[in-house]
């Protein structure tokens, strides 16, 4: 019941995805061969959200793995949980997209897309009542961004009434993997604004910061970063997979967090994040979790929520706790930091409580916020885009695949519109008069 089909595209998407299935399998007591080795009926009660039960009681992930080159797939297949996936669900090309959005979206990716859609259709048909799709991908590369957005557009046509959610790794301000990131990201955002229901924005730099500052890791690897992403992904879907006192599903998250259809880019955070050495010195309480998950240092995207205001937010708690306490804390956060929440949406925090904590913790909370501060990220990418596009730098790689200049201009203006929409709602007040107070407050930050 209420199944989710998981799609991972490109290198980044597949690496996060592989880690995600480790985390989920761990929570549900499924071992790397797909056999159930858990100790509690609760693990099996709704295991079919993410798993198909095959013959002989084997649990197979509802996952579709796509890439335009075989490398990452082979690594996933050789990895610890590689034998878990259905071999037919690995769909890959041989050429690679070479960090080129146009290759992923128009040429190489377009050739592969039909076989991907067949596999996705196959997964969707084996569902009782498909709730939606979740995709992990990056926006800076070629396959995850180009082919990922192509697939999103195609699925949108075919399943218009199902939730489409993405976990998108955006280019970070200081750490850049690719010179043409701004192009790829802007072209992707152009698609994502129109075709997805909810996008969780992550970025490597913020994840590195969490690893350094909070987890006190001296040399964080991509494995550590991906693990952080996965705890969030697991938290967002926990109340679908385990019984809870206050449930939420993908649709509820969307309804409660998106006041205007285009503004569906969320920041995510997770608590408790403590370094390995200092865990035993901290009490895990609901106030502590709430305080930590609203903390700017815990946001997994390089935009500071203190520079904007929250339109809406949602806290998903896991573990045994009193719902009364959760409600009190939510109210507390809103009254204490009222200037960080727009006043024209009263009670704009949604809470949910799921009884089963993640492995190794007594309780945890996942934070999802729709903050106007996320415009910082779009603004930054947009500026880099404009700087390169002004000089038509690197453009021949894209036009060579049949793209038109117009598409770039459109994507650029769509991104700028998005930024100004966020800005407009950040400044709006309940009585809709230009509040001088608000403007001054914005300058002080």
Curated annotation (Swiss-Prot):
Composition bias type Acidic residues, residue spans: 429-445
- InterPro entries in UniProt: Beta-tubulin_BS (IPR013838), Beta_tubulin (IPR002453), Tub_FtsZ_C (IPR008280), Tubulin (IPR000217), Tubulin/FtsZ-like_C (IPR037103), Tubulin/FtsZ_2-layer-sand-dom (IPR018316), Tubulin/FtsZ_GTPase_sf (IPR036525), Tubulin_C (IPR023123)
Binding site residues for GTP: 11, 69, 138, 142-144, 204, 226
Which cofactors, if any, are listed as required?
A: Mg(2+)
Main location class: cytoplasm
Compositional bias per record (Polar residues), positions renumbered to this chain:
417-426
Provide this UniProt record's keywords sorted from A to Z: Cytoplasm, Cytoskeleton, GTP-binding, Magnesium, Metal-binding, Microtubule, Nucleotide-binding
Which residues are noted in the entry as Mg(2+)-binding? Answer: 69
Q: Which Pfam families match?
A: Tubulin, Tubulin_C
Q: Which PROSITE patterns match?
A: TUBULIN, TUBULIN_B_AUTOREG
Region (Disordered): which ranges?
Answer: 417-445
Biological-process GO terms, alphabetical? microtubule-based process
Q: Where in the cell is it found?
A: Cytoplasm, Cytoskeleton
Which Gene Ontology cellular-component terms appear in the entry? cytoplasm; microtubule
* UniProt GO MF annotations: GTP binding; GTPase activity; metal ion binding; structural constituent of cytoskeleton
| SUPFAM superfamilies for this protein | Tubulin C-terminal domain-like, Tubulin nucleotide-binding domain-like
What family does this belong to? Belongs to the tubulin family.
Report quaternary structure and partners.
Answer: Dimer of alpha and beta chains. A typical microtubule is a hollow water-filled tube with an outer diameter of 25 nm and an inner diameter of 15 nM. Alpha-beta heterodimers associate head-to-tail to form protofilaments running lengthwise along the microtubule wall with the beta-tubulin subunit facing the microtubule plus end conferring a structural polarity. Microtubules usually have 13 protofilaments but different protofilament numbers can be found in some organisms and specialized cells.
Q: Which PANTHER family match?
A: TUBULIN
Which purpose does this protein serve, as stated in its record? Tubulin is the major constituent of microtubules, a cylinder consisting of laterally associated linear protofilaments composed of alpha- and beta-tubulin heterodimers. Microtubules grow by the addition of GTP-tubulin dimers to the microtubule end, where a stabilizing cap forms. Below the cap, tubulin dimers are in GDP-bound state, owing to GTPase activity of alpha-tubulin.
Return the protein name: Tubulin beta-3 chain
């Amino acid at each position: 019941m209420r199944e989710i089909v998981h799609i991972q595209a490109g290198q980044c998407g597949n690496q996060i995805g592989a880690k995600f299935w480790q985390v989920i399998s761990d929570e549900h007591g499924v071992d790397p061969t797909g056999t159930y080795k858990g100790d509690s009926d609760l693990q099996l009660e709704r295991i079919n959200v993410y798993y198909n039960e095959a013959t002989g009681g084997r649990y197979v992930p509802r996952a579709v793995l796509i890439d335009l080159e075989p490398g990452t797939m082979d690594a996933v297949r050789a990895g610890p949980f590689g034998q878990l996936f259905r071999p037919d669900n690995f769909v890959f090309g041989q050429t690679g997209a070479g960090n080129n959005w146009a290759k992923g979206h128009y040429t190489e990716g377009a050739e592969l897309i039909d076989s991907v859609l067949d596999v996705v259709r196959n997964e969707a048909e084996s569902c009782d009542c498909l709730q939606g799709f979740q995709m992990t991908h990056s926006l800076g590369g070629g396959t995850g961004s180009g082919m990922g957005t192509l697939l999103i557009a195609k699925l949108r046509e075919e399943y218009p009434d199902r939730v489409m959610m993405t976990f998108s790794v955006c280019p970070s301000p200081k750490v850049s993997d690719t010179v043409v990131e701004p192009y790829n990201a802007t072209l992707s955002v152009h698609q994502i604004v129109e075709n997805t229901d909810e996008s969780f924005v992550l970025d490597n730099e913020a994840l590195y910061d969490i690893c350094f500052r909070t987890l006190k890791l001296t040399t964080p690897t991509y494995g550590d970063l991906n693990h952080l992403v996965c705890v969030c992904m697991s938290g967002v879907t926990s109340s679908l997979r385990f019984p809870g006192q206050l449930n939420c599903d993908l649709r509820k998250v969307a309804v409660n967090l998106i006041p205007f259809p285009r503004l569906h880019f969320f920041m995510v955070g997770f608590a408790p994040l403590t370094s390995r050495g200092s865990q035993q010195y901290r009490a895990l309480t609901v106030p502590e979790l709430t305080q930590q998950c609203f903390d700017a240092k815990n946001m997994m995207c390089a935009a500071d929520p203190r520079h904007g205001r929250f339109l809406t937010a949602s806290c998903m708690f896991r573990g045994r706790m009193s719902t009364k306490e959760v409600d009190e804390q939510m109210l507390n956060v809103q009254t204490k930091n009222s200037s960080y929440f727009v006043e024209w949406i009263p009670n704009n925090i949604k809470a949910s409580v799921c009884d089963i904590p993640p492995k190794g913790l007594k309780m945890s909370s996942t934070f999802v916020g729709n903050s106007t501060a996320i415009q910082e990220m779009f603004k930054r990418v947009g500026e880099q885009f404009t700087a390169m596009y002004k000089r038509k730098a690197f453009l021949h790689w894209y036009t060579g695949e049949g793209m038109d200049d117009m598409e770039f201009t459109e994507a650029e203006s769509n991104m700028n519109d998005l930024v100004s929409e966020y800005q407009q709602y950040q400044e709006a007040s309940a009585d809709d008069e230009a509040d001088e107070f608000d403007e001054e407050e914005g300058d002080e930050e």
